[in-house]
Amino acid sequence: MKRRRSAKKSPAMVTVTDWKGLDCGEETRIVRRLMKFEDLPEYLKDNEFIHNHYRCQWSLKDTFLSAFSWHNETLNIWTHLIGFGIFLWMTVVSCLETTEISLAGVFNGMAGVRICLSSNQTLLHDSNVTHHISCLTSQGEAIPKWPWLVYLVGAMGCLICSSVSHLLACHSKRFNVFFWRLDYAGISLMIVASFFAPIYYAFSCHPNFRLLYLSSISILGLLAIITLLSPALSTPRFRPFRANLFLAMGSSAVIPATHVLCLYWDHPNVFIALGYEIATALSYFVGATFYVSRVPERWKPGAFDMAGHSHQIFHVFVVMGALAHCVTTLLIIDFSRASPSCGF
């Protein structure tokens, strides 16, 4: 008598109508398809004005491969991934070049700016700094490069955490909670890192103030990360709170910036650096405004699902602000090198 072969039980195929009430911990094999907002589990419902093209609990392999497919997170992933590539390029150049760091390849293509850290050059080779910014040699001790690298690494950390979070947070509830916390930690890291280079170089003659400012922003960043570890603060309801927290951290730069102006008010080049820093602040502020208001998708729900929604615009402004801050930092390095004595 022949025994019937017992077929292996195949994983359950979950259709779009089965999502409501689904336990994300269940072992399920999900059809790789894009979902509508109303069919998502609660933890994936972040923006009700984006109606379609959601990934939901895809396999890890499919989730990784979705970086190369078209859905409502594609541009969120790539806007910051491209930004990461730009900062990685600058980091490699900064580490490899011993006498000169040229950022012409990045800034010539974006704003016609050429920035370098070199020797035996004039501070402003061209009066129009948006087209050409040069730097002077240090007539004394070599200026340390590590604060500049701290900023580059912090920016890269923020951008790659953001890209990976947008890519993988849809895989499961556990991934969702973990990666959005990682994303917020990355933002805090970038804010703290952005303080290091300008403060280190600007207060080279005032080590006590330098220590005070760097310690203060580091403590604020640590407190922000601890605060945002709360799962409740990762929910859409606290979107304004998160934006205001990050803006408050960034706004604290007003204090050391004002201090620098008081110390070096008679140096016109300081005001050039300040102009770029104002551009940085405006970029972050405008980006945060889009992030909180969820414009333009709020005005026409469903029309900006794939491209043009607020979070994508927010990402673009973050990268623009980070690049403007690079110019500020390199200008401050130039000023520090140009000085025949301590500081500027």
Curated annotation (Swiss-Prot):
Q: Which InterPro entries match?
A: AdipoR/HlyIII-related
Look up the coiled coil feature and give its residue ranges.
none
UniProt superkingdom: Eukaryota
Membrane topology, as annotated: Multi-pass membrane protein
Cytoplasmic topological intervals: 1-76, 169-184, 232-244, 291-312
Tissue occurrence: Expressed in roots and flowers.
Which keywords are on file for this protein? Membrane, Stress response, Transmembrane, Transmembrane helix
Say if the entry is tagged with keyword DNA-binding: no
Indicate where this protein resides in the cell: Membrane
Q: Name one GO biological process term.
A: response to oxidative stress
**Keyword Transmembrane helix assigned:** yes
Official protein name in the record: Heptahelical transmembrane protein 3
Q: Which organism is it from?
A: Arabidopsis thaliana
> What is this protein's gene name?
HHP3
